[in-house]
Structures are given as structure tokens and as C-alpha cells.
């Protein structure tokens, strides 16, 4: 028993503060060895110390003061070194040297036993507190107790150590952690971390790239990016990544592996996050709602993109042509136009695209998959966005309104096209003949006039068309489908444009006005025909008689009259 001395040592556990180690005082018997103040001191870096607010710093000093009392109680003294603030030297906040262990246990200072808590508004470092209080100790205040082999042999003479004695027991076989201060410290620490998130303060800055963080832990994690920059390389294509997990996901591009499968429909994905997003299709959940207009989305990124509609902000500008965009991804895609780059290639037919979304849409041509079904009419679609647009046919919803004339549309693209009527803008020009259009699909359709290509063929009658939309409309002739119904009179149409024209009968609206004579029309095509009266333009020429007409319909009538006359003549000759 004489070979044993009662000691204090730190028990290290994870705490709320990044990088810090929570030290619990543990009292146990161990073989006689040199004990230092560092053994029970918690050491912080400058960044970690700045993480604490004044209340936490005070609490920390109180805990360390208690540790110091315990060491004095057990026979460890601390030297009186100059009170230099360690924080100013960017060293650990608490760094104290001790005297060598004395032959006999040192005295217990009565000054330390008077109170357990230092001043609440103390600004000094803990080292200065210790030195100031230790300096007040005089020899007459020291009460020595020699030859103590254990704690219970040492009789406490000051009331200030009553609480300390309660934490200690004379049982040599057990270890009792005293976490009286640690619990309070942990509570303060979590409260401070929570407050930092609300204030948006980011005190921890990366010296390499300048990025700031609100927590030291996040900065530590971020620093690993610089340490292991591009350290994980793909053996297949040589592309390098900062994270092993990113490399693992990348490899699936080469292997085609899709380990994350939807239990509802069996569709598989390369990433778990994509599967999570996909599942919302089945549940219909849209947890992300716009505070401005109330519109809801199933992805936070979609909400972020949507918000820019209200602000009108376009921070991403093309250096080549000056065009601005509200998304960085849209700018990246736009740049492919200038470069002529088409990095996304279809493995089935080798067709290339400048957008990944275009490739994805294209692939459905080969698979014929239509997983999105309309509950109203049972029609299937290969895209959820297409289904959303289709549903507006049944509901009559037109959320996109023109600010100039008040006309509403069920698709944003239709509103964009409509606005060009007011501006007169036609940005899409044919290189072959110079004709300009306000929509790129119109230019694409026009180009086929020059090539004569008709890739879309009707399986029913074999008729070919230059556009897939025209083929879709044509098929309704065979099926008799008329999905566009007038709510006013119940009349149905196989084209939405026909329904739009029909509705004007009920409203009497004539929004297309002739600038020359002021006459108004309910259709833009009628206005175009009318204008030829003023210009005396007659672009339609009859090959039979060289007569010219200002309307194609008049030319058709002329041709029909020739055809009827020819037919009558042939019949007359047959009767002779």
C-alpha cells in the first residue's frame, strides 16, 4: 500500500467542440510515477479556443482551476512563471510547468478552498488566474499533512473541499468519473454551436482557398480535399477525383451498374440519391414550396431554380456572346453551341447531343417506355413534365400569363414564343434561304423543306411527315381521338390550335390589328393574308395560266377549277 499514491488523470471522450477532448477527472490508485499538470489539462489550438464564447471560456477556466486544486491536494505544485498570455503567441491556451515532486506532500492552500468559481467577467487567461491566486498564498496559510498514503488518511481541514471529498471514495477497485462540470460545459457548447447556425457567422476560414465554415469540424473535413486533391484516378479513362466515393460512382458509367432499385416499379439507378428523388414520383410528395407563389417541388434544387423567376436575376453571362442565364448549368450547355461540342452520344444509334437531358429523352425512342400515365384519360407519357403539361388540357389551367396583353398559356415555352409577337424578334435564321423564325422547332421544320426529308412515318397508312408532332396529330385521324374540348359548347378537336381558334368565336376577341387600316382579326394568319391587300403582294403563282394570287387558298381554288374542267372534258370525250 505504501508503494501506491492516489492520482488524477484525464479520461478522453468526444465532446461537442471540434478537436477538443473532454477530460473527466478519474481517481484511482496506480503505481508511483511523476504526475504533471499537463496530465489533467485540456489543450486547445487558437482556432478551437476562439470557437468558445466568453461563458464557455470562463467555465473552462473553472474546470481547470478545480483540476489545479486537486493536484495541489495530491502533491503537485505549479511554478510561478511570468504571466504571458499564451493565446497571443498562438500556442495552447494552458501551458504550465510544475516543480519536481517534493519528498513530502505539499501544503493545501486555504485561499483556493474559499470559493470554487472565479469572477464571471474575468478576461485574463487561465494561466494568469492561477498565478494571481497562487501568488497570494503565504507560508503561514499552508497547512502541511505529512506521510499520507491514501485519500481517506488525509484529513481535510477546509470546508471548501467537502464537495471534492464527496466525489472521492476509498474503494480502490473502482473508478469514479466526476462529470459535474463536463455536463454543463457540453450544454453550453451545443447551445453556442446551434446559435452559430442561425447567425450565419463563419469564423473558420481555409487558408488555401478562402472558403469559410461555421464549425471547426467542417473546416477540418474540408482541408482533406486539398490534401488528397485528385488522388483517386479512374483506371478506365484516367479521370481523377478528390473522393473515393466519387470515383466509385464514376466507375458505374463504364460498368453500367445500377445497384439502387425502386421496389415500386423496378427501375434501377446508379446513385441512391437519384432513387430517393425517383420515389417521390410514386408518392406525389412535393415538400419544397415557394413562399412567393405557393408552387411546390419535389426537389430543393428545382425550388432554387424556380425562385429566380420571381427575382429575374441572371448572374451567369456568356463571355462569347454576352447572353445571360439564371443557372450555371444552362450557361455550360449554352457554351456547347459556340464550341459545336456534343459530348453525349447514344450507344444505340451513335446520335450525339449537347445536353445529357436530350440524350435521355432520345433513348426513350429506342425503348418506347411510357411510365407516366394520366389518371383522367389513361394516356401514357415518357416524362413526368409531359404528363404535367397534358393534365392542363383536362383542368384548363394556364399559369403563364403575358404581361403585355394578358393572354395566358399552359406552357412557359408558348408564353416565350408569344412574347416575340410584341417584340417582333425572330432569332432563328435559316442559313439556306435567310428566312427567320421565333422558335427553333419552326426553323428545324423549315430546313426539311430544303432537304425534303420526312423521317416520321405513319404505320397505319404509310404517310410520312417532317415532324413528329405532325405525325402525332395525323394519327388522330385513324383513332378518331379529339382530346381538346371546348368548355363553352362541348365541341372537341384533335388539335389544341383548332380549339384555341374556336374559343375566339365565344369571346369575340380580335387581338391582331392591321397597322395600315386598323382592321382587327382573331387570327394572326388572317392578318397576314389581309396585309397583302395593302402591299398588293401575290406570291402564289399558277403554273397553268400564270395568274397570281395573294392567298394560297385562292390558288388551290383555281387549280381545282382547272381540274374540274379537265375532268369534264375527259368525260365528254369518253362519251363520244
Curated annotation (Swiss-Prot):
Q: Which GO terms describe its molecular function?
A: chromatin binding; DNA-binding transcription factor activity, RNA polymerase II-specific; RNA polymerase II cis-regulatory region sequence-specific DNA binding; zinc ion binding
| Superkingdom to which the source organism belongs | Eukaryota
Zinc finger regions typed C2H2-type: which residues? Answer: 176-198, 204-226, 232-254, 260-282, 288-310, 316-338, 344-366, 372-394, 400-422, 428-450, 456-478, 484-506, 512-534
- Give the main location: nucleus
Q: Which Gene3D superfamilies match?
A: 6.10.140.140, Classic Zinc Finger (3.30.160.60)
Location(s), subcellular: Nucleus
Q: What is known of its domains?
A: The KRAB domain is necessary for its repressive activity.
Whom does it interact with, and what assembly results?
A: Interacts (via KRAB domain) with HDAC2; the interaction is direct. Interacts (via KRAB domain) with HDAC1.
Name this protein carries in UniProt: Zinc finger protein 431
The source organism is: Homo sapiens (Human)
Q: Which gene encodes it?
A: ZNF431
Amino acid at each position: 500500500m505504501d508503494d501506491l499514491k492516489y492520482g488524477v488523470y484525464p479520461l478522453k471522450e468526444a465532446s461537442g467542440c471540434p478537436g477538443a477532448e473532454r477530460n473527466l477527472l478519474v481517481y484511482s490508485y496506480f503505481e508511483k510515477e511523476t504526475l504533471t499538470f499537463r496530465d489533467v489539462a485540456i489543450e486547445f489550438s487558437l482556432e478551437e479556443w476562439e470557437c468558445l464564447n466568453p461563458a464557455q471560456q470562463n467555465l473552462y477556466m473553472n474546470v481547470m482551476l478545480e483540476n489545479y486544486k486537486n493536484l495541489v491536494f495530491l502533491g503537485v505544485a505549479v511554478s510561478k512563471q511570468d504571466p504571458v498570455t499564451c493565446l497571443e503567441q498562438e500556442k495552447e491556451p494552458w501551458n504550465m510547468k510544475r516543480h519536481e515532486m517534493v519528498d513530502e506532500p505539499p501544503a493545501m492552500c486555504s485561499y483556493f478552498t474559499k470559493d470554487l468559481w472565479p469572477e464571471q467577467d474575468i478576461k485574463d487567461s487561465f494561466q494568469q488566474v492561477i498565478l494571481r491566486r497562487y501568488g497570494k498564498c503565504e507560508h503561514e496559510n499552508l497547512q502541511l499533512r505529512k506521510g499520507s498514503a491514501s485519500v481517506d488518511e488525509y484529513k481535510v481541514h477546509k470546508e471548501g473541499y467537502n464537495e471534492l471529498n464527496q466525489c472521492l471514495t476509498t474503494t480502490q477497485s473502482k473508478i469514479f468519473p466526476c462529470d459535474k462540470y463536463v455536463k454543463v460545459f457540453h450544454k453550453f457548447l451545443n447551445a453556442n454551436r446551434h446559435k452559430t447556425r442561425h447567425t450565419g457567422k463563419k469564423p473558420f476560414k481555409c487558408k488555401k482557398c478562402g472558403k469559410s465554415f461555421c464549425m471547426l469540424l467542417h473546416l477540418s473535413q474540408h482541408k482533406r480535399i486539398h490534401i488528397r486533391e485528385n488522388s483517386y484516378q479512374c483506371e478506365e479513362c484516367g479521370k481523377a477525383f478528390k473522393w473515393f466515393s466519387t470515383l466509385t460512382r464514376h466507375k458505374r458509367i463504364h460498368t453500367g451498374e445500377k445497384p439502387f432499385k425502386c421496389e415500386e416499379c423496378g427501375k434501377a439507378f446508379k446513385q441512391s440519391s437519384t432513387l430517393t428523388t425517383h420515389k417521390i414520383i410514386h408518392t406525389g410528395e412535393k415538400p419544397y414550396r415557394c413562399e412567393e407563389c405557393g408552387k411546390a417541388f419535389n426537389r430543393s434544387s428545382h425550388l432554387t431554380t424556380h425562385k429566380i423567376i420571381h427575382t429575374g436575376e441572371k448572374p451567369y453571362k456568356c463571355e462569347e456572346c454576352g447572353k445571360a442565364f439564371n443557372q450555371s448549368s444552362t450557361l455550360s450547355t449554352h457554351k456547347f453551341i459556340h464550341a459545336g461540342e456534343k459530348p453525349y452520344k447514344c450507344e444505340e444509334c451513335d446520335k450525339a447531343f449537347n445536353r445529357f437531358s436530350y440524350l435521355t429523352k432520345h433513348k426513350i425512342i429506342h425503348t418506347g417506355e411510357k411510365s407516366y400515365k394520366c389518371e383522367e384519360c389513361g394516356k401514357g407519357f415518357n416524362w413526368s413534365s409531359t404528363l404535367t403539361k397534358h393534365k392542363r388540357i383536362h383542368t384548363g389551367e394556364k399559369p403563364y400569363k403575358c404581361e403585355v396583353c394578358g393572354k395566358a398559356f399552359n406552357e412557359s415555352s408558348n408564353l416565350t414564343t408569344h412574347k416575340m409577337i410584341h417584340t417582333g424578334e425572330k432569332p432563328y435564321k435559316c442559313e439556306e434561304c435567310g428566312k427567320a423564325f421565333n422558335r427553333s422547332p419552326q426553323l428545324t421544320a423549315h430546313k426539311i423543306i430544303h432537304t425534303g426529308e420526312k423521317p416520321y412515318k405513319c404505320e397505319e397508312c404509310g404517310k410520312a411527315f417532317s415532324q413528329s408532332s405532325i405525325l402525332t396529330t395525323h394519327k388522330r385521324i385513324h383513332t378518331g381521338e379529339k382530346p381538346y374540348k371546348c368548355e363553352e359548347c362541348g365541341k372537341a378537336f384533335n388539335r389544341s390550335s383548332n380549339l384555341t381558334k374556336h374559343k375566339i368565336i365565344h369571346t369575340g376577341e380580335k387581338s391582331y390589328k392591321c397597322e395600315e387600316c386598323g382592321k382587327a382579326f382573331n387570327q394572326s394568319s388572317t392578318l397576314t393574308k389581309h396585309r397583302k391587300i395593302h402591299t398588293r403582294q401575290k406570291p402564289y403563282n399558277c403554273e397553268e395560266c400564270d395568274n397570281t394570287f395573294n392567298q394560297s387558298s385562292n390558288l388551290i381554288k383555281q387549280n381545282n377549277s382547272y381540274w374540274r374542267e379537265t375532268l369534264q372534258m375527259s368525260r365528254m370525250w369518253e362519251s363520244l
